[in-house]
Amino acid sequence: MAGNSKRRGAVRKAGTKKGPTVGSGGVRRRGLEGRGATPPAHQRPNHPAAKRAAKAAKQQQRRPARKTDETELVLGRNPVVECLRAEVPATALYVAMGTEADERVTEAVQIAADSGISILEVPRSDLDRMSNNALHQGLGLQVPPYDYAHPDDLLATAKADGAPALLVALDNISDPRNLGAIVRSVAAFGGHGVLIPQRRSASVTAVAWRTSAGAAARLPVARATNLNRTLKSWADGGLQVVGLDADGDTTLDELDGTGPVVVVVGSEGKGLSRLVRENCDAVVSIPMAGPTESLNASVAAGVVLAEIARQRRS
């Protein structure tokens, strides 16, 4: 009978699907499918490309971490020394191997050591990479992001001081040196804080720290998501909002700064933005003799703050 494997003389071949032996364990299927796609060269253990990739990974692990967008790397011997003298809260001082130890390098290392700042000697190529090949003179100082206060914290600081609030808000100020100088003036004349917009404004960078001469470590700087809305809120809370502009309709001599006040400073070029100007209780100008049309923003802020401080002492 055809197909009867029990008949006499029949021989069963090994590996057939008939009888107790079923399947081949996938051998035939794998044989038909082949070995699949060839992996990339860098994933083949014995390929030169894989060896190069492994070597590069090991070198990357030994390198100092590249600074992120949130940190700042101050470069150059003079800027680094100035930041350290101003007590900028740095986290690491990078020194390129083979850097000549002149007076500035020696001072930077000494201040960093006395301040508990990590001192890392790295290959010059690593510092080149971290600085995007900018001129660093063998020194780099890593500065963490500034810890901004909330706008309400400025009012709380004034309340704790027991004096009428004296705040400064910046509008269209993009130069961090102006910001640092204003922070320094606010601290010098008894102010309680500085408010800056979250966008399109200078921020507290290492340059601002250095210009503030350390005042940024003592005076809170807050960021407002919407400057105009924050100023309105402060006005509703009893603060006088005083804009500072060369075209102001009130002179500084006429300003009464003895009560709670926030001085809004615009840039030398653009001045105050339209919405901010419209929401000021007064827009003040500084009387000047001679042909000078305007003052630098930080200088103008210092003049107004000095006058308010004089009034409060009287």
Swiss-Prot record:
Protein's UniProt keywords contain S-adenosyl-L-methionine: yes
Domain of life: Bacteria
Keywords: Methyltransferase, S-adenosyl-L-methionine, Transferase
InterPro entries: Alpha/beta_knot_MTases, Ribosomal_eL30-like_sf, rRNA_MeTrfase_TrmH, SpoU_MeTrfase, SpoU_subst-bd, tRNA_m1G_MTases_N
CDD domains per UniProt: SpoU-like_RlmB
Keyword Transferase: yes
EC category: transferase
Gene Ontology CC annotation, any one: cytosol
Example GO molecular function: RNA methyltransferase activity
Ranges of compositional bias, category Basic residues: 1-16, 49-65
Residues annotated as binding S-adenosyl-L-methionine: 266, 286, 295
GO BP term (any one): RNA processing
NCBIfam families: rRNA_methyl_3
Family from the record: Belongs to the class IV-like SAM-binding methyltransferase superfamily. RNA methyltransferase TrmH family.
PANTHER family to which the protein is assigned, alphabetical: 23S RRNA (GUANOSINE-2'-O-)-METHYLTRANSFERASE RLMB
Annotated protein name in UniProt: Uncharacterized tRNA/rRNA methyltransferase Mjls_5122
Source taxonomy: Bacteria, Bacillati, Actinomycetota, Actinomycetes, Mycobacteriales
